[in-house]
A protein has these predicted regions:
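Active-site mouth of glycoside hydrolases
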Residues: 1-105
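Proline-centered flexible-loop/turn and helix-kink motifs
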Residues: 33, 67, 123, 216-219
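Generic recognition of flexible, low-complexity loop/linker segments
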Residues: 26-28, 81-83, 114-117, 154-155, ...
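Catalytic-core region of carbohydrate-active enzymes that cleave or remodel glycosidic bonds
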Residues: 67-68, 88-184
Length: 249
């Protein structure tokens, strides 16, 4: 669960003092910590640069040096928390958001930026794309309506540009719990969402099922990115072909 949403100034991740944020999060850990959870300390906020000390202090105050469950951050689009947080003892894995943007610049950040170049930096941390483009969401930057093909591209790239650890799938109608064809609250720029009970059976969701079956049939934890496998890589990031091989070849 996300512990402190931090998109707007009115949300707890921004509105609460460090002391109160720690108190609230400690309560959440006490209430739910016995379950098999992954703690996402901050949700959709800015955690880098001048903001990093505040979030480090909150993380240390809540989890100390040895959290009983995995802990990470869910940053805003194309923010890399690895540089500021990977050495924190409470920080378990690097979560990032490639986001809902299919411009050349955005895709290049995924396939040539930190997820693809920083994975070997020590101390090593698993790397997970926690928010690639959601199915049937509309990109406010390009106007693209992301379909199942866009879902597959984002998922395979996310799983292969870094050592395979996982990726998430989202649908515009599911994250918002849309009950009819409607525009999600405060998200007008992303377009209308279909009802969640239709969205759960979408083509993209079936693609992710097959992807999970494929990776589950191999020793996915041994995969490492290997760009040399593709001899003629397209010149544009939008057509980038991700490739990986096992450690033993």
């Amino acid at each position: 669960p996300v512990m402190l949403w931090a998109i707007w100034r009115t949300e707890p991740g921004q509105a609460l003092s460090e002391k109160d944020a720690i108190r609230l999060c400690r309560y959440l850990v006490a209430r739910w910590g016995a379950y098999n959870v992954v703690w996402i300390l901050g949700g959709d906020g800015s955690y880098l640069g001048k903001y990093a000390p505040r979030w480090k202090n909150i993380g240390r105050g809540v989890f100390g040096d040895a959290p009983a469950r995995p802990v990470t951050m869910h940053p805003g689009s194309r923010q890399w928390t690895g540089g500021d947080f990977r050495a924190e003892k409470w920080f378990s894995f690097i979560g990032y958001q490639s986001g809902h943007n299919d411009s050349e610049e955005a895709v290049k950040w995924l396939v040539e930026g930190p997820p693809a170049t920083e994975w070997s930096t020590r101390p090593a941390r698993p790397i997970v794309n926690m928010e690639p483009n959601y199915e049937e969401i509309t990109s406010p930057q390009t106007g693209t309506h992301f379909d199942a093909l866009a879902v597959r591209k984002a998922m395979y790239r996310s799983l292969l540009v870094s050592p395979t650890a996982g990726a998430t799938y989202g649908h515009h109608g599911v994250w918002s719990w849309a009950e009819t064809w409607e525009v999600p609250l405060n998200h007008d720029k992303f377009g209308k969402a279909r009802p969640w009970y239709e969205a759960v059976n979408s083509e993209g969701s079936q693609s992710v099922k097959h992807l999970a079956q494929l990776f589950g049939s191999i020793r996915w934890w041994t995969l490492r990115p290997d760009r040399e496998m593709v001899q003629n890589q397209p010149s544009t990031a939008l057509q980038f072909i991700a490739s990986a091989r096992s450690e033993d070849g």
